[in-house]
Amino acid sequence: MFAEGRIPLWVVGVVAGIGAIGVLGLFFYGAYAGLGSSM
């Protein structure tokens, strides 16, 4: 699966994209929940 023991670039991009979306989603969800509970 791995080319010369290195991870393919597209795999890194997919993992990074999912991670970034997950972090941003949790951040915005936390901010929205915090604002909603404070009002």
Curated annotation (Swiss-Prot):
One of its GO terms (biological process) is photosynthesis. The keyword Disulfide bond does not apply. This is Photosystem II reaction center protein J. Belongs to the PsbJ family. The modification N-formylmethionine is found at M1. Keywords: Formylation, Membrane, Photosynthesis, Photosystem II, Reaction center, Thylakoid, Transmembrane, Transmembrane helix. Its main location: membrane. It holds the Pfam family PsbJ. Disruption phenotype: Grows about half as well as wild-type photoautotrophically, assembles about 50% PSII. Electron flow is deregulated; forward flow from Q(A) to plastoquinone is slower while reduction of the oxygen evolving complex is faster. It is a single-pass membrane protein. It comes from Synechocystis sp. (strain ATCC 27184 / PCC 6803 / Kazusa). InterPro entries: PSII_PsbJ, PSII_PsbJ_sf. One of the components of the core complex of photosystem II (PSII), possibly involved in regulating electron flow. PSII is a light-driven water:plastoquinone oxidoreductase that uses light energy to abstract electrons from H(2)O, generating O(2) and a proton gradient subsequently used for ATP formation. It consists of a core antenna complex that captures photons, and an electron transfer chain that converts photonic excitation into a charge separation.
